[in-house]
């Protein structure tokens, strides 16, 4: 029997209740809010992706208008060689040789976005990527902006970039 050695660090949700106290639910230490508050505050949820073999995906729980920020990464920029996270597929390249580590940020809900690849479009599983990653500096952050209007219930899809599959 194989023993699961995965450690999940849980913390209390960072949201306040209506009475001003702290929410009693827990969340992964890398996400500030529990599922219910992430849905209320960010208008997003994480659940099983519609794409086969893609694990979880990010879903809109409210409509987003074209150009609106849907999700973001905000963490320190590190050199890829210094960071093991780039091997997991959750690092977002901000410039050549540098990434933002989506696994160590509390606003990294964008890390759950999958890519709508051509074969998935042809099989009508998705209709193309609906957000684009935009990097800004001082401080470094990556914003996922809507390429078109997104309806509540839509899965969020972003292009991983040309180099992503070349490196795999």
For the regions a protein language model found, what residue spans apply to each?
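Catalytic cores of histone-lysine modification enzymes
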Residues: 41-133
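Cys/His-rich Zn2+-coordinating "finger/knuckle" modules used by eukaryotic regulatory proteins
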Residues: 11-40
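Intrinsically disordered, low-complexity regions enriched in proline, serine, glycine
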Residues: 22-26, 35-36, 46, 72-73, ...
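Short, flexible, mixed-charge glycine/proline-rich loop motifs
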Residues: 2-8, 25
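Beta-strand cores of modular interaction/reader domains in eukaryotic scaffold and signaling proteins
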Residues: 12, 33, 59, 63, ...
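C-terminal SET catalytic tail plus cysteine-rich post-SET Zn-binding segment of SAM-dependent SET-domain
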Residues: 6-10, 117-168
């Amino acid at each position: 029997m194989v023993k699961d050695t995965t450690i999940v660090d849980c913390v209390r949700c960072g949201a306040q209740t209506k009475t001003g106290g702290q929410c009693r639910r827990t969340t992964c230490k890398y996400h500030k809010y529990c599922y219910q508050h992430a849905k209320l505050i960010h208008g997003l949820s994480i659940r099983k992706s519609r794409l086969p073999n893609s694990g979880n995906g990010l879903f809109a729980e409210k409509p987003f208008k074209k150009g609106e920020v849907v999700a973001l990464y905000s963490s320190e920029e590190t050199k890829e060689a210094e960071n093991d996270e780039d091997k997991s597929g959750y690092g977002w390249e901000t410039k050549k040789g540098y990434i933002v580590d989506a696994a160590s940020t509390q606003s990294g809900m964008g890390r759950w976005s999958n890519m709508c690849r051509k074969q998935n479009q042809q099989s009508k599983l998705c209709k193309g990527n609906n957000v684009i990653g935009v990097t800004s500096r001082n401080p470094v952050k990556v914003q996922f902006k809507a390429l078109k209007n997104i309806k509540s219930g839509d899965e969020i899809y972003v292009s991983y970039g040309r180099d992503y599959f070349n490196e795999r």
